């Protein structure tokens, strides 16, 4: 039963990634934490995200300046390593509370944010200070609580259209996922069971990416955000209550 649920989680997560370029970790951690140790879901999400990102590199390769996305990606790696190291020292009960609170904020953001229209504005050619800062913070959040999309999408969607935003997210998530996985392995969190789960997710991952990419130009991203937001509200409340009950014992 556990492996069937993992396949379904993988399909949903990578369908969302195929459409938006992000959301994979959020879905895997949100749904996976219902039947897997919450910490291990973040390790699993980082591992499978390496393959998910690589599978999308050649999908809709709109041009983005290397001087723009590479510095952001490198600082995401730095933040990811710091976040993954922090994950190893935070007690599990506190982690559940932190994760639940973060999900609740993320859910509200997904529900109420309205994307702006960018028209034909050209993308930047060089990363600015704010771009680098947001990349670092997002990397830390991804390594620590498994959520890095909200700060990235909130910031970069102000001046990147749908296609270029998806492209940026695909490119910068791959090195960050590799760094997180390597750090988890060094800290002893990446074990044999996580590897088995990740490899088992691969077939559903490819199907999800394929389906998501096919619907990229035909489905509303705002509907996805609202649906995911409602789901995350339920999961976040459950995690917060579970963390509180664990502290009370």
Which residues are covered by each model-predicted region?
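Transmembrane helix exit motif
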Residues: 54-61, 84, 100-123, 213-214, ...
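Glycine/small-residue-rich loop that forms an oxyanion/phosphate-binding "nest" at active or ligand-binding sites
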Residues: 64-110
């Amino acid at each position: 039963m556990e492996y069937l649920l993992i396949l379904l989680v993988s399909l949903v997560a990578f369908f969302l990634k195929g459409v938006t370029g992000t959301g994979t970790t959020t879905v895997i951690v949100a749904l996976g934490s219902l039947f897997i140790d919450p910490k291990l879901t973040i390790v699993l999400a980082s591992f499978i995200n390496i393959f998910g990102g690589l599978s999308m590199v050649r999908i809709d390769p709109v041009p983005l300046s290397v001087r723009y996305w590479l510095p952001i990606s490198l600082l995401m790696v730095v933040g990811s390593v710091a976040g993954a190291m922090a994950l190893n020292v935070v007690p599990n009960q506190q982690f559940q509370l932190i994760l639940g609170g973060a999900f609740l904020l993320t859910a509200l953001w997904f529900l109420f944010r309205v994307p702006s229209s960018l028209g034909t504005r050209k993308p930047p050619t060089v990363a600015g200070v704010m771009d680098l800062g947001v990349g670092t913070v997002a990397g830390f959040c991804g390594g620590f609580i498994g959520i890095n999309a909200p700060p990235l999408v909130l910031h970069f969607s102000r001046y990147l259209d749908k296609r270029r935003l998806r492209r940026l997210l695909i490119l910068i998530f791959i090195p960050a996922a590799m760094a997180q996985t390597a750090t988890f392995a060094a800290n002893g969190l990446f074990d044999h069971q996580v590897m088995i789960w990740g490899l088992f997710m691969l077939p559903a991952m490819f199907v999800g990416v394929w389906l998501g990419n096919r619907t990229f130009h035909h489905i509303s991203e705002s509907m996805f955000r609202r649906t995911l937001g409602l789901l995350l509200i339920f999961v976040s409340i459950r995690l917060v209550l579970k963390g509180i009950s664990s502290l009370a014992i």
